Amino acid sequence: MAEAQIKKNIFTISSSPHVRCDESVSKIMWSVCLALTPAAVFGVFNFGIHALEVIITGIIAAVVTEYFVEKVRNKPITITDGSAFLTGLLLSMCLPPDIPPYMVAIGSFIAIAIAKHSMGGLGQNIFNPAHIGRAALMVSWPVAMTTWSKLSASGVDAVTTATPLGILKLQGYSKLLETFGGQGALYKAMFLGTRNGSIGETSTILLVLGGLYLIYKKYINWQIPVVMIGTVGILTWAFGGTTGIFTGDPVFHMMAGGLVIGAFFMATDMVTIPMTIKGQIIFALGAGALTSLIRLKGGYPEGVCYSILLMNAVTPLIDKFTQPVKFGTRR
């Protein structure tokens, strides 16, 4: 413990500019967990005890994996800094409520051991760990990852039904409106969260409030969620309709699927996004465009996870072309 504390307090000599603040990795991670808590609690209310089991399993598996990997690597144990807890929480919030616990545990293991520590650990991973875990589960168990149940709050449980994006993809916009009883009722369900979907992605209002808290604390920049969500809105409005250009429903698409949780809590991951504001805007534009492309033209109803991972892959390239020019030199 003493050795870990000494390493934590070692100063690194480097050129200016220097960041001077009392923020720490631990404080930021636990603040993000706090911002996600209302949406997670609402997900448990919506989907019942199964959702709680998924969340607890995801968190415990992530923390335990972190502990043993750091033990094997002979690294300081950092399970109290909140990073593994956050990865497990984010992953579980992006999963169906009835997914078997062993799949959740495998997803957390992949997120921590492979996506995070195989790259060197916290601060060195190229891809968002939670999304790597989710993508691995989607490839390995596609049926379990696309099987949904009605909300427990509705009084009926364990009845297979589709998500709003699934209805739109398979049956069209008219059937979507018919299912929810009109456009107004659809928007209300999407905004409040009384709809089907992954555990933590249903309530737009709670996720936005959590995101605004992080913006207020200056832990994330507002440009990424605004540009990403706005890009999806514009492109789905222009090309998402069936009767011509600019006949799509942008309001629905901006609240649907995992866009809000992805834009506020995953696309803003400070480790896997570009360093400059210009680069972050390019990142958000690309993620929004890819999400729209997958939703409108792909075989899968949702594209947030894959769009963010693809943009993670080109982040070094974006950084290369958006880094500030040194004084007295040319690009």
Curated annotation (Swiss-Prot):
Q: Which UniProt keywords apply?
A: Cell membrane, Electron transport, Flavoprotein, FMN, Membrane, NAD, Phosphoprotein, Translocase, Transmembrane, Transmembrane helix, Transport
* Parts of the chain that traverse the membrane: 23-43, 44-64, 84-106, 196-216, 226-246, 251-271, 273-293
Q: Name one GO biological process term.
A: transmembrane transport
Q: Which residues form a coiled coil?
A: none
Per the entry, which co-factors are needed?
A: FMN
- Write down the InterPro entries for this protein, in alphabetical order: NqrB/RnfD (IPR004338), RnfD_bac (IPR011303)
Q: Which residues carry this modification: FMN phosphoryl threonine?
A: T163
Question: Which E.C. number(s) belong to this protein?
Answer: 7.1.1.-
GO CC terms = plasma membrane
Topology in membrane: Multi-pass membrane protein
Quote the PANTHER family the UniProt record gives: ELECTRON TRANSPORT COMPLEX PROTEIN RNFD, ION-TRANSLOCATING OXIDOREDUCTASE COMPLEX SUBUNIT D
Q: What is this protein called?
A: Proton-translocating ferredoxin:NAD(+) oxidoreductase complex subunit D
Please tell me the species this chain comes from. Answer: Clostridium ljungdahlii (strain ATCC 55383 / DSM 13528 / PETC)
Q: What is the lineage of its organism?
A: Bacteria, Bacillati, Bacillota, Clostridia, Eubacteriales
